[in-house]
Amino acid sequence: MEIRGIFGVKVGMSQVFTTNNERLPITVIYCEPNQVAGVKTEAKDKYSATLLSFDTVENKKLNKPQQGFFEKNNLKPTKHLQEIRNMTGFEMGQQITPQNLFQVGEYVDVSAISKGRGFTGAIKRWNFKIGPLGHGAGYPHRFQGSVQAGRGGASAQRVFKGKKMSGHYGHEKVTVQNLRIVGFDEANMLVLVSGAIAGPEGGVVLIRTAKKKPGVVKPIELAVQTEKAPEAKPAKLSKKKQAKELAKAQAANQQTVEAKVDTPVVEPKPTEVKKAAPVVEKKGEDK
């Protein structure tokens, strides 16, 4: 089976609507172009794989062996280096984008590292039933109960390996199968995948060919959504606050009315036009 895959970063979740008015929850994944940093072959390495590098960083943030690897192969320094087995047909230094590997509606498997929850009890870790809270049950109520396997003799006097008990929970690889590619946002380098995937926001994600449905495509038609400004809803106030607001409004109206009555109306005076004095000529004066 031909394997295709690409690495990205989980951004978060959202939702879209189809033409049948069905709400479809989606996960948004940021996928910048992955560069091929190495090619493994059956003849030389006894297995076939493609080494991908992603998440470009400054060269000074890498250690000496990593800097030497990228300088030797004339590649951009990146934060992550990881290979995908049985992925063939690519050359050294080639840039891979999700649009080149998948199409809208194609089934894929998405792998990520789940959120780490530390040391947890059996109730949270294995969904055990909580103990009785009353009738003299006593404390604590969240014990997992007996883990005893036998009482001696022919019975085993030990706890078998794999027993569901308290312990470290989370921070493990989780793969969700048979999700579909809903769409691409080439301008922002985003991939929309149906459903939820493991891991926190900002976690590394692997999108690869579906193991159970390789190459199967089921088209998805999304409804065109027109963005509208949300209407401002009046705030709900209690009766006391409504009475206070009404009293303030009435007082403000009364003050404006009183101000209009008290202020005298001043009429503008008509402008007086000054006439020029007549010129009188004196007789009998020679210049």
Swiss-Prot record:
GO biological process, any: translation
Keyword Ribonucleoprotein part of the UniProt annotation: yes
Cellular compartments per GO CC: cytosolic large ribosomal subunit
Region Disordered, annotated ranges: 228-287
Skewed-composition ranges (Basic and acidic residues): 269-287
Alphabetized GO MF terms: rRNA binding; structural constituent of ribosome
PROSITE patterns referenced in this protein's UniProt entry, alphabetically: RIBOSOMAL_L3
UniProt KW keywords: Ribonucleoprotein, Ribosomal protein, RNA-binding, rRNA-binding
Taxonomy, superkingdom: Bacteria
SUPFAM superfamilies attached to this UniProt entry: Translation proteins
Keyword Protein biosynthesis (UniProt): no
InterPro entries assigned to the protein according to its UniProt record, in alphabetical order: Ribosomal_uL3 (IPR000597), Ribosomal_uL3_bac/org-type (IPR019927), Ribosomal_uL3_CS (IPR019926), Transl_B-barrel_sf (IPR009000)
Regions annotated as coiled coil: none
A Pfam entry, by short name: Ribosomal_L3
Disulfide bonds: none
Family classification: Belongs to the universal ribosomal protein uL3 family.
Oligomeric and partner information: Part of the 50S ribosomal subunit. Forms a cluster with proteins L14 and L19.
Function: One of the primary rRNA binding proteins, it binds directly near the 3'-end of the 23S rRNA, where it nucleates assembly of the 50S subunit.
Protein name listed in UniProt: Large ribosomal subunit protein uL3
UniProt organism field: Mycoplasma pneumoniae (strain ATCC 29342 / M129 / Subtype 1) (Mycoplasmoides pneumoniae)
